[in-house]
C-alpha cells in the first residue's frame, strides 16, 4: 500500500483563513489521499495561509519560509506553497525572493491546488495563480468534513467597502455571494456529521445577498431563519459584520430565531465621527448606537464585542476620548484593539501621521484596560448563573477537565465525562478567571 502524503498547514489571521485552510486539507485529501501532520519536518506538502492585515505581514511570511528552506535540500519532492492575502498581494515577487517556493495561490484559487501541484511536478516550474474566479472556488471544493461539533461556513467572499486603511478588497477581490441553496446544503451536510454550531463567514457577512433558485435574493436574516430549521443545528453565529448593513431584518432575527447566539461581533473601529470619515466607514457613531439600542431592546442579554484602531492618522486626544466614551456607553465585551498599521497601497497610507508612537501605545493601553475591565465585570456577573455549554473537548491545561463555550462566547472549564464532548451541557458557573470561567455540571 502506497504511503499517504503528509500535509502541514500554518494558518495566520482571521476565521476565514481557518475555513480556507480546512478546505485546503479537504481538496488535497480528495485528490492525493493525504493526512494532516502538526510537524512540518515530516510533511510532504507545506503550506502557509497568510494574512496581510497587520504591518510587516510579508516579513513574517518570509521568516517562516526561511525555516523551511533547508528542508527542501534534504527532501527534493517537498512541495512548499504560499496562500492567502499576502500571496494575492505579492504574487510572483514571492518566487523571486524565495525561489524554492513551488506554489503561490490566492484565497479564490484553493480548489486549483491539486492541479498546480501536478503542473509543478511535471514542469519543475513554480506555479502562481492569484486570480479571482468568482464563485468557482465553491463549485469545485469537495463535500465538507466536520471536525467536532462546530464548523465555519463561508457564505460570501471579498469586500466592496474600501475602508481607507484596509487591504482586504485588494487581496480578496470584490464581494461575491454563494448561492442560497449551496450554503444550506453545506450546513445540512455538516449537521448530518454531528455539527451543532455554525459560524457563517464573510468579510462583510451581513451584506450577504445570495441568489436563490427561484430568481429571488436572500439576505443574511433569511439565510439564518432557514439554517435554524436544519435538524441538529442548535447555535448560529456570524462574522465579520459592518454597521452600515446591519439591517432591521437582521436585528429582528434576534427576536425570532433562538438559535442565533446572544453574542455579536460588530467592528466599529473608532468612536469619533471625524476619524470614521477619514477611515471611510460611511456611518456615524449615533447611527451605530441606534442600532445597538434596537438590538438590545429585542435581545437584552446580548453581549457585543468589536474591533478598534487607535492612532489612526490625525487622531487627537479629543478623538480618543470619544472612543473611550463609546466603549463605556455601549459596554463592549472582549474585543480586539490595535495601533493603526500602515498598509501600502491604501489611501490612509498617504495621510500625514505626526502622533508619536509613545502616545499611541499609551492610548492602546488605556483602551485595553477599559475593555478588559468591562469583560471582567460581565464574567463576574455570570457567576451563579446556569449556562448552556457546547462541549468542545478537554482543557488545554488538564485532560481530565472538559472545556466548552457559552452562548456569549466565554470559555468554561468543568469536570464531566468525555462522552459529553460534541454535546450541549448545562453548567453552573462557579468562578470567574481572567480568561475563562469555571463551572459545575448540573
UniProtKB/Swiss-Prot annotation:
Which residues bind [4Fe-4S] cluster 2 per the record? 159, 163, 166
Task: State its Enzyme Commission number(s).
Answer: 2.8.4.3
Q: Where in the cell is it found?
A: Cytoplasm
Residues given in the record as [4Fe-4S] cluster 1 binding sites: 14, 51, 85
Q: Where is the MTTase N-terminal domain?
A: 5-122
Per UniProt, residues of the TRAM domain are 380-442
Which keywords does the record carry? 4Fe-4S, Cytoplasm, Iron, Iron-sulfur, Metal-binding, S-adenosyl-L-methionine, Transferase, tRNA processing
Task: Provide the Radical SAM core domain boundaries.
Answer: 145-378
Note how many cofactor molecules are bound and how. Answer: Binds 2 [4Fe-4S] clusters. One cluster is coordinated with 3 cysteines and an exchangeable S-adenosyl-L-methionine.
Entry's InterPro entries? Elp3/MiaA/NifB-like_rSAM, Methylthiotransferase, Methylthiotransferase_CS, Methylthiotransferase_N, Methylthiotransferase_N_sf, MiaB_methiolase, rSAM, rSAM_horseshoe
Q: Main subcellular localization, coarse class?
A: cytoplasm
Question: Care to name a GO molecular-function term for this sequence?
Answer: N6-isopentenyladenosine methylthiotransferase activity
The protein's annotated catalytic reaction(s) are: N(6)-dimethylallyladenosine(37) in tRNA + (sulfur carrier)-SH + AH2 + 2 S-adenosyl-L-methionine = 2-methylsulfanyl-N(6)-dimethylallyladenosine(37) in tRNA + (sulfur carrier)-H + 5'-deoxyadenosine + L-methionine + A + S-adenosyl-L-homocysteine + 2 H(+)
Mind telling me which residue stretches traverse the membrane in this protein?
Answer: none
What Pfam families does its record include? Radical_SAM, TRAM, UPF0004
The protein's matches in PANTHER family, at most eight in alphabetical order, are given as:
CDK5 REGULATORY SUBUNIT-ASSOCIATED PROTEIN 1, MITOCHONDRIAL TRNA METHYLTHIOTRANSFERASE CDK5RAP1
Q: How does it assemble?
A: Monomer.
Family per record: Belongs to the methylthiotransferase family. MiaB subfamily.
The UniProt function text for this chain reads: Catalyzes the methylthiolation of N6-(dimethylallyl)adenosine (i(6)A), leading to the formation of 2-methylthio-N6-(dimethylallyl)adenosine (ms(2)i(6)A) at position 37 in tRNAs that read codons beginning with uridine.
What the entry lists under NCBIfam families is as follows:
miaB-methiolase, MiaB/RimO family radical SAM methylthiotransferase
Name used for this protein in its record: tRNA-2-methylthio-N(6)-dimethylallyladenosine synthase
